Amino acid sequence: MNRRRLLVSATLLSYLLYGMALVSVEASGGEKLRDNLDLTKTTTSSPSISHRKMLLLSPGTGKTERSVEPERIGEKCKSTDIVVNQAVTEPMPNGIPGYMVEITNQCMSGCIISRIHINCGWFSSAKLINPRVFKRIHYDDCLVNNGKPLPFGSTLSFHYANTFPYHLSVAFVTCA
């Protein structure tokens, strides 16, 4: 019964937060923002720029402009090639919420990225995480895969448990 009550409470809370987000976007006068708002996606560190260069029409002028290409970290790599996704999972038996994190090398040109550092605040977990997979070195600095390369197309994942999710984003990487 407790699990069911927790599920119902979490569902109601998510609808309440979604409604509050829509109200705040509406209050800020951003109808264009509301069209782009999608709260069903998982957290990601990469912007929504595609890997192809697209020509966009400037509003009002009708002239074309190029989209901004992500900053490159090597001949083959872009800073957005490492993507961090996070999703809610089943809570631990003691009720602490659980989260799954996936860190993926999405480089399309076959680059191998190493020394992946993640902005992670005071990251901690009630569930043990293999420190060779993910560990906090200092405040807001977590190391992925013990600094070893993450080959292109590879995904590294781990689970953690805490009363709230941490905002995880790529701080810096090295491209080989």
From Swiss-Prot:
Phenotype of gene-disrupted mutants: Male-sterile phenotype due to the absence of tapetum. Presence of extra microsporocytes in the developing anthers. No effect on cell wall degradation during microsporocyte formation.
Instruction: Point out the signal peptide segment.
Output: 1-21
Q: In which tissues is it expressed?
A: Expressed in leaves, young seedlings, inflorescence meristems, floral meristems, carpel primordia and ovule primordia.
Q: Which InterPro entries match?
A: TPD1 (IPR040361)
Presence of the UniProt keyword Disulfide bond in the record: no
GO BP annotations listed: anther development; cell fate determination
What does the UniProt function comment say about this protein? Involved in cell specification during anther and pollen development. Required for the differentiation, specialization and persistence of tapetal cells in the anthers. May serve as an extracellular ligand for the EMS1 receptor kinase to signal cell fate determination during plant sexual reproduction.
Its name, as the record gives it, is Protein TAPETUM DETERMINANT 1
Species per Swiss-Prot/TrEMBL record: Arabidopsis thaliana
> What lineage does UniProt assign to this protein's organism?
Eukaryota, Viridiplantae, Streptophyta, Embryophyta, Tracheophyta
